[in-house]
């Protein structure tokens, strides 16, 4: 387990609060839900959902694939996929208020609430998975990634972002190598991409096979 304490105060206070808090995350994101899109996209130049969505479309060209959007939030990533013809999308997020906004966008077949520090119990396994913005400084940690990857059927694909600043500050590459070895999934690619442009934060986009 990585016990480093990076200085997240160098970021916008809204991000710093999210990056430093490990307790009551559901409440935190419930309180942020109403302004989340404008804060991130308009104020901070958030592009993670676009860059990850573009990688996803390369990896999963079949628009009839069953897709789980993990940490779907208000639906930014799901909406981007839907705009490119993907229709079989379910969403899951920690925050009920975020899910309410996503529901109003009429993107998802089903919406579920879950904390991925625990295993996700589902009656089905998905053909593919997109997870944008969940793995960063706080929780869930890289050591919880198997809970995400296990949602996808063998032979499927996972496209998962990791906050690039956290990747460097916390040496998350080493944690990922340990997690993939421990749980037997393959990291096929690690792609450098955008994340939050106005904050100078990039991302690592992981392409993973269960």
Which ranges hold each PLM region?
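Class I SAM-dependent methyltransferase SAM/SAH-binding core
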Residues: 68-120
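Conserved Class I S-adenosyl-L-methionine
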Residues: 171-191
């Amino acid at each position: 387990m990585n016990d480093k304490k990076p200085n997240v105060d160098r970021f916008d206070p809204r991000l710093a609060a999210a990056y430093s808090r490990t307790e009551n995350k559901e409440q935190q994101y419930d309180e942020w839900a109403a302004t989340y899109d404008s804060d991130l996209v308009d104020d901070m130049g958030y592009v993670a959902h676009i860059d990850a969505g573009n990688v996803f479309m390369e990896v999963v060209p079949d628009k009839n694939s069953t897709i789980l959007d993990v940490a779907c939030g208000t639906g930014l990533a799901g909406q981007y996929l839907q705009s490119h013809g993907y229709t079989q999308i379910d969403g899951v997020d920690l925050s009920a208020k975020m899910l309410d906004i996503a529901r109003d966008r009429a993107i998802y077949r089903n919406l579920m609430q879950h904390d991925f520090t625990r295993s996700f119990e589902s009656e089905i396994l998905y053909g593919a998975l997109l997870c944008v913005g969940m793995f960063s400084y706080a929780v869930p940690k890289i050591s919880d990634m198997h809970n995400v990857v296990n949602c996808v059927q063998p032979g499927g694909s996972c496209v998962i972002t990791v906050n690039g600043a956290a990747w460097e500050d916390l040496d998350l590459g080493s944690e990922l190598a340990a997690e993939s070895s421990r749980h037997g999934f393959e990291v096929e690619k690690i792609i450098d991409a955008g994340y939050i442009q106005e904050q100078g934060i990039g991302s690592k986009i992981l392409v993973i096979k269960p």
